[in-house]
Amino acid sequence: TEAYTRDLAGQRRTLVPLYSLMVATEPLPDEVWDRIGLRGMELFADDRRMVIYGQRTVDGRIAFGGRGAPYRYGSGIDTATESASGAHDRIVATLHELIPATRDARITHRWGGVLGVPRDWRPSVGLDRATGLGWAGGYVGEGVAAANLAGRTLADLVTATESELTTLDWVGHRSRRWEPEPLRWIGIGGGRRLAEWIDRQEERRQRTSRLASVLDRVVR
């Protein structure tokens, strides 16, 4: 259920819904790809705290995404954010900054969705043997790979198979619950603004900000 876990009884504070948004360029001509590279369809990202990620697509586009859409009070979900928001414009600006060769390319697609985020940003897998209820989730945007691993781990737990998967740290892990509102809204919004400020400061000074450790303690 990930971000929609908020709709289950008693689970409003288990995961918060945070948006991850993406854009895609038109197919780029070969001369532009000669400047960019990515001949092997590599994924790319960097170490900024406001996460970004991208990939060359099979049809020659760049698909590029990141965070930045504001958290909605009370764990709200607004589907309009997924297709049209100022956060998309900021993602496009970041793409142009990171890969200037894309500045003249049309942006043909904008989309997004909500992620399920635990309080400590750590996914978990588990099985309650008394009830037979298993769970897996809190992938924070890494679900394509993590859900596959979680499914195989759950299969071993259900069949009581001891394996290297069932000894992983996320098995049986329980994240603490998110703070009640309005503390949740204040904390997430303030953390996002602090992360943006730290990114700007580190870009300007070319060294780790002293506030980075403060943000890490707040997030975890």
Regions found by a protein language model. Give the residues of each.
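Short hydrophobic core segments
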Residues: 1-4, 151
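Active-site substrate-recognition segment that forms the wall
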Residues: 3-31, 35-131, 212-220
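Short beta->alpha junction loops/turns
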Residues: 114, 139-140
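C-terminal lid/capping helical subdomain adjacent to the catalytic/cofactor pocket in oxidative enzymes
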Residues: 129-134, 140-220
